[in-house]
Amino acid sequence: MARHPGLLLILLAAVAAVATTSRAQWVGGWNVIEDVAGNNQIQRVGAWAVGKHNQLGTNDRLQFVRVVAAEEQVVQGSNYLVVIDAASSRKKTRELYVAVVADLVGATTYQLSSFKLATK
C-alpha cells in the first residue's frame, strides 16, 4: 500500500480548519442578529409572538414594546429566538420574555414554539 504524506497533511489541515470554525457558522447553528432595533422583520416577529401569546388565553395580556436581542437558526426556513420587552396591563410592569418562533419554508404564518418570562 502506497503512502501519501502530502494527502495526510491536506487532510489534517482541513480537519483543523473545521475544528476552529465557530458553531455559528454551521448550518443549524444559532447566529446573533445585529442591530435588532433597526431590523423591521425581527421587530415584526416579536410583535407577532406577543400577539399569539395573548391569543392563547393567558392572563398576561402583554403589550409589545420592542425586541431587544435576537438570534436566528437556519434550518428548513428559520427559527428566531427573540428577547422581547413587553408591558403587562395586569401587573402594570414591563418585563423581558424569551420566545422561539419558527418561520418554516412553505408555511403561511409563523409558529410559536415557546414563550416564557426571561430568567435573570
Swiss-Prot record:
<feature type="short sequence motif" description="Secondary area of contact">
    <location>
        <begin position="73"/>
        <end position="77"/>
    </location>
</feature>
<feature type="signal peptide">
    <location>
        <begin position="1"/>
        <end position="24"/>
    </location>
</feature>
<keyword id="KW-0964">Secreted</keyword>
<dbReference type="InterPro" id="IPR000010">
    <property type="entry name" value="Cystatin_dom"/>
</dbReference>
<comment type="similarity">
    <text>Belongs to the cystatin family. Phytocystatin subfamily.</text>
</comment>
<dbReference type="GO" id="GO:0004869">
    <property type="term" value="F:cysteine-type endopeptidase inhibitor activity"/>
</dbReference>
<dbReference type="Pfam" id="PF16845">
    <property type="entry name" value="SQAPI"/>
</dbReference>
<dbReference type="GO" id="GO:0005576">
    <property type="term" value="C:extracellular region"/>
</dbReference>
<keyword id="KW-0732">Signal</keyword>
<dbReference type="InterPro" id="IPR027214">
    <property type="entry name" value="Cystatin"/>
</dbReference>
<dbReference type="InterPro" id="IPR046350">
    <property type="entry name" value="Cystatin_sf"/>
</dbReference>
<keyword id="KW-0646">Protease inhibitor</keyword>
<dbReference type="GO" id="GO:0006952">
    <property type="term" value="P:defense response"/>
</dbReference>
<comment type="function">
    <text>Specific inhibitor of cysteine proteinases. Probably involved in the regulation of endogenous processes and in defense against pests and pathogens.</text>
</comment>
<keyword id="KW-0611">Plant defense</keyword>
<keyword id="KW-0789">Thiol protease inhibitor</keyword>
<protein>
    <recommendedName>
        <fullName>Putative cysteine proteinase inhibitor 11</fullName>
    </recommendedName>
</protein>
<feature type="site" description="Reactive site">
    <location>
        <position position="28"/>
    </location>
</feature>
<dbReference type="InterPro" id="IPR018073">
    <property type="entry name" value="Prot_inh_cystat_CS"/>
</dbReference>
